[in-house]
């Protein structure tokens, strides 16, 4: 059997695979904020990015390595293809971390070998020991992945895994790259690897999966029963296509059904020892932070973190819950950090009080960003009688979007009504500090604002999505706006909140435009799709 650390290790790849979701690109400050929250959550490994992809990705991984973790914190991991330039860039980026890992991979399925890598099995068998050994020359902790393992020939897969372990790999990852496999098949695959790889006892067995058939979490739980001891997942299940296995669902399944899973770890069913090191009370906070910063809205009926996850509409259910919550609830909402607590901050509250609450919510702002957030808080306090944590999260989340801001919104004025043509006057401050104003008509107030902004910024794009939701209850609630725009096939999202949804829409659109402009001219390399941009000798 594979090496057993005595519990399930949680490998979070929100900042790498999760960020590959269309429109979910994050800037350096946003990535750092998420990494700091992941450390509070208690994940074992943070895959901080793909350093070779771009200078921006390298800088973000390096910043996280410098600022997150510590001797008692998570391992900081970087992804690299089986290529010396990739591996060297990864090693340099993660170098500042006290605990670091290089995660390198190569495809093993015949379809990938023939159509993507254009290599033979023998060539792959030659590459694996060279690249794992090269990674091992930089760090003690090396993870090796067999890309598309779920569709690979088993005998060849066993051979590759054995070779990777003998070359120094500490963790072997088995990805279901295209979300194709079913739970029973995945369980059998993990069991077969345990039974047919002679040196598997020298490495931890890990799994990585996508949700194309909606089976990622079920697949992982079956893998755990058969010896997998590291789960690679993302907050809110974000990721390419249909997403990745959702961290919060995996954690709570192992938490709520501990008595079922305990025997697979050699424990008695009643053992109270947690199966992971994750602090479940940080789950909701982590989910909201990732949703706010990526602009990817969590579906209301999403398990564990959706708005309806703990809601009861049926009269029969409501009656049962009022008598005893266990009648219809298997999870106490407080276990995942969900509460309706109001923050006792008002007009006379100081910056230190606001900073303390923000830190509790997972935000660590610098002085300038704190001042901006505090100003917005005071403005909101003048307009709202009660301010909730959700309000505070909404008004502060866009502060970490500003470091790359090339356009700043200064003024929005709208005139509209039943007998008026919607008209917007907008003033924007450019990178050079020059103010420009435009007036535009539209089919509605938001359309007029967007047209005015387009005439000022001159950044062609296609508006793909516009959504508004209320942050809290009440007529004075903040309106949270998410906007997605597209240029050249790439999606960029913007997010903002205000009691005036037109103002929120204008700021969200500006935030999306800033992401678009910042990304223009510095396209990142995709770790699985872009092979031409690497020295072929190293693959």
From Swiss-Prot:
The keyword Amino-acid biosynthesis applies. Catalyzes the condensation of the acetyl group of acetyl-CoA with 3-methyl-2-oxobutanoate (2-ketoisovalerate) to form 3-carboxy-3-hydroxy-4-methylpentanoate (2-isopropylmalate). Its EC number is 2.3.3.13. One of its GO terms (biological process) is L-leucine biosynthetic process. Keywords: Amino-acid biosynthesis, Branched-chain amino acid biosynthesis, Cytoplasm, Leucine biosynthesis, Manganese, Metal-binding, Transferase. It comes from the Bacteria. Mn(2+) binds at residues 17, 208, 210, 244. Pathway: Amino-acid biosynthesis; L-leucine biosynthesis; L-leucine from 3-methyl-2-oxobutanoate: step 1/4. PANTHER family: 2-ISOPROPYLMALATE SYNTHASE 1, CHLOROPLASTIC-RELATED, HOMOCITRATE SYNTHASE-RELATED. Belongs to the alpha-IPM synthase/homocitrate synthase family. LeuA type 1 subfamily. HAMAP family: LeuA_type1 (MF_01025). InterPro entries: 2-IPM_HCS-like, 2-isopropylmalate_synth_dimer, AIPM/Hcit_synth_CS, Aldolase_TIM, LeuA/HCS_post-cat, LeuA_allosteric_dom_sf, LeuA_bact_synth, PYR_CT. Pfam families: HCS_D2, HMGL-like, LeuA_dimer. Coiled coil: none annotated. It comes from Prochlorococcus marinus (strain NATL1A). It catalyses: 3-methyl-2-oxobutanoate + acetyl-CoA + H2O = (2S)-2-isopropylmalate + CoA + H(+). It is found in: Cytoplasm. PROSITE patterns: AIPM_HOMOCIT_SYNTH_1, AIPM_HOMOCIT_SYNTH_2, PYR_CT. This is 2-isopropylmalate synthase. Homodimer. Residues 408-539 are annotated as: Regulatory domain. One of its GO terms (cellular component) is cytoplasm. Its cofactor is Mn(2+). The keyword Metal-binding applies. Residues 8-269 form the Pyruvate carboxyltransferase domain. GO terms for molecular function: 2-isopropylmalate synthase activity; acetyl-CoA C-acetyltransferase activity; manganese ion binding.
